[in-house]
Each structure stands twice: as structure tokens, then as C-alpha cells.
Amino acid sequence: MERIKELRNLMSQSRTREILTKTTVDHMAIIKKYTSGRQEKNPALRMKWMMAMKYPITADKRITEMIPERNEQGQTLWSKMNDAGSDRVMVSPLAVTWWNRNGPVTSTVHYPKIYKTYFEKVERLKHGTFGPVHFRNQVKIRRRVDINPGHADLSAKEAQDVIMEVVFPNEVGARILTSESQLTTTKEKKEELQGCKISPLMVAYMLERELVRKTRFLPVAGGTSSVYIEVLHLTQGTCWEQMYTPGGEARNDDVDQSLIIAARNIVRRATVSADPLASLLEMCHSTQIGGIRMVNILRQNPTEEQAVDICKAAMGLRISSSFSFGGFTFKRTSGSSVKREEEVLTGNLQTLKIRVHEGYEEFTMVGRRATAILRKATRRLIQLIVSGRDEQSIAEAIIVAMVFSQEDCMIKAVRGDLNFVNRANQRLNPMHQLLRHFQKDAKALFQNWGIESIDNVMGMIGILPDMTPSTEMSMRGVRISKMGVDEYSSAEKIVPLHQSKVECSSPH
């Protein structure tokens, strides 16, 4: 306060005001700051005062032959004075307007080819349908998603070589185009762009969009294929969603889908062969998707799906160690465990042989309508934070986490016999038996779990065994979060094939 009074006092003296408004800035440090280096220190200000000048643009002398000195209104378009320090002409912004209206029109045949991804986007939006807007709490999970529809799947390095070859064919520098996709793309693009007048740099940028998959880690609720991600800002907010059906597919989404289907078929066939690993690798090498060898696609494609991960692991590529259980994708974010067989008794005195995970671990659980963070120790749930669209979705997540925790009170809550079978009439493994049992009726599980009083934490509330929210009590270790829970993004160690096969059929 004292400082402000002092400043006010100074400003009221006319001499101060004069010094501040009239004195030139000639302090060396300030001049250095604003004049050293090529980088503009205050671009907005520079633009403002440049545009306030009569001739802020400089152009090649040839412009004087192509543009009249004055426009129809008699305004001067360029100055007869040369630009200081170069032999260029000083030009008015009005010259740009004149050129846009009256300048020569070049052939537009290359535009749809260069700006292909934009033209395709416009078509998808034109033919897409936007449905009603619903207001509800959105559960968004950050996921790695593909943000530019319609691209090929070249690595950044491969694409760079293709772009250099297409756009700057005469530049020096070793470029080795080896893969089929590189060669076909180069040939195709060279033919398309013959006689193209668009600036090479722009062409290079556009080709990059077309050739390389760009991914971002974005909060998403709903469709994650690139044709949904391009309209993310239109389809979901914090408390609303708008239904949307894309007006067309993009080839990269088709490739992702085909890759998943192919990988599943290959894994299924490899499992029953005499040498699963060898046969899986052989099939990956001999399969083509959209004319590109599957092994090449696997190297570039970040799709995370069990069968795809198995194929990647077999090839020795890095994968993220996630697995599915009860319709949720579990991703371990910290901790570790060892597996050990253990026999346990259910509430019906039936003996189950389960694989117990010994050790402290933290997981993110990601499902269609709910997400959660789970912290567990050996056969003990320490903490579960759930976020979901509705009561039903939250209950599903809690059941899966309780079964996954392998706690004794969960196993003792079993009433009746466990005899669930799959579609091929084979008995399910014990963990899935337990899951099915409680998915049918979780009442005993929730009642048996135990409750505790809770502290008031912002954004968190408790949940009682009958699924009603509470601010005082909650099932032991379980809390409901009003915000979404992020999927963890990282590529962990390579899982050997035989291990990942077990991992993917079931986490236990």
C-alpha cells in the first residue's frame, strides 16, 4: 500500500510524467534485449505498428510489373522508394487485396490432392449426422488416440524420406526407400504432383499429415477412432454429450480394425499348433492388410488390444502390459507381484485353486462406462476410487475390483455352487467363476465386505452396500470420485509370448 501511495505521489508531479513519456530509451541492456538475435521479442506489438505504417510489406521488384501503382479507388499500392538495406519494393497491404481480386488464377487441379485430408474431413462432416445433446456427468479417460484421419502408417523417418524424394528430388542427401509402402507412395505422389505450383513447404506439411499417424493423450468418453476424435470438441463437454455418426470412414481406422481381427485369428490358430510361437510369427509375416505386410503395420501401429499385443511381443516389440478382466482393462501403474497357486474355501465349502498375486500393486481400471484406480496388496483391497456414469456402472466396477482383490471375505460370500461354463461348454477358471457368480447377485458380497466411517474429501463420497451414496460411511476402502480417472500411458517391459498368452486369457 505504501509503495502505491509513493508511486501516485510521484506521478502527480509533472516532471515525473514528462520524464516517463518524453525520454528516449537508450539504455544499452534494453536495446540489447530487443535487438539481439533474429527472434522477434514482441510479435504482437511488432505486427501492430508495422500494419499502422503505409508500406509494411517488402516484395521483389518484379511486382511493379504485375500490379498497378494505384487501385480503382486511386489508393497507392506500392512505393517508388526502395526498402532500406535491400533492393526490394515497399508494398501496401492493399496490394494483397488487389492481387487476391485481380491477380492471375493458376490451375486448382492440385488443391484437392494436396489438401486431401481436409477435403475428406469436409465430406465426412457434410454427410455425418449430429443427434440430440444429452446433459449428464461425463466420465472421460485420457487415452492415446489417433488425431489425423486418413493417414498411411509410415514411421516419421520413412515419411521424411518419401517427402524429400517427392518434394525435393534434386536435393543432396542419402534417401533409401525400402518398404513397399514407401515406394508405392513415392510413385503415386510424384505422378499426382507434376506441375504443382503450391509452395514445396506446404506440400511437405500436407504430405506429413497424410503419411504419419499423429497421436495425442486426450480425455475421451465414447468413440476413440480418429473420425470421432476429429469432432471431439463437438461431441463432449464436461457435462454434456452430443450424439454423432461420422459421414464416412478413414482408411487408418479400417486398418486398425482389420489388424485386430487378423491378430485375433492368428493367435487363435497359433495356440492350437505344435509350435505356437513359430507359427504365429510365420502367419504375421505372410499376412497382408490393405496390401501392406502385417509385420510392417505392427511396427508402426499403436493399437492396444490383447491379440495385437501378443503378436507384437512375439516380434520382440515393446508393448504396454495391460490385460482384461471382467470387461475392464487393467493397467499396472506401479508395484509388482509374483504368482502362487493357493487353495481356498468358498462360503459353500467348495475348494477353489486360485493364482494369488503376492505383492503391492496399483492399477487403473478402464471400462466402457466406468473407470477406477485400485491399490491392492496380497489378497487385500487397500483402496478403490471409482468414477462412473450411473449406479449400475459403478456397481460393475466395484464387483470386478473386489473379485480381483482375491480377499477372503469375497470368497466366503459365495452362496451355492460355482459351475459356470463358456460357449464351448468348458468350465471357466476359478477367478471367472467368482466374477460370474457375483455379477449375477452381488448382495452378499457387498453386505459381507464391511463398512467404515469416512473423512470429508473434496470430490469424493462414500458408497453403502445398497449402492446409495453417503458422506459419512462407505464400504471399506471404496470411494466414489466425481471426476474421471486417467488411463495410464506408458510402454512397459516386453512380455514373453507364453506369459502374455496366460495374461490375456485371464489375469490369474
UniProtKB/Swiss-Prot annotation:
Keyword Ubl conjugation belongs to the record: no
Keywords: Host cytoplasm, Host mitochondrion
Organism: Influenza A virus (strain A/Wilson-Smith/1933 H1N1)
Gene Ontology terms: cellular component: host cell cytosol; host cell mitochondrion
Keyword Nucleus: no
Domain of life: Viruses
Signal sequence coordinates: none
Protein's job: May participate in the inhibition of type I interferon induction through inhibition of the host mitochondrial antiviral signaling protein MAVS. The knockout of PB2-S1 has no detectable effects on laboratory infected mice.
UniProt feature coiled coil, ranges: none
Subcellular location: Host mitochondrion; Host cytoplasm, Host cytosol
Protein name stated in the entry: PB2-S1
InterPro entries tied to this protein: Flu_PB2_2nd, Flu_PB2_CAP-bd, Flu_PB2_middle, Flu_PB2_N, PB2_helical
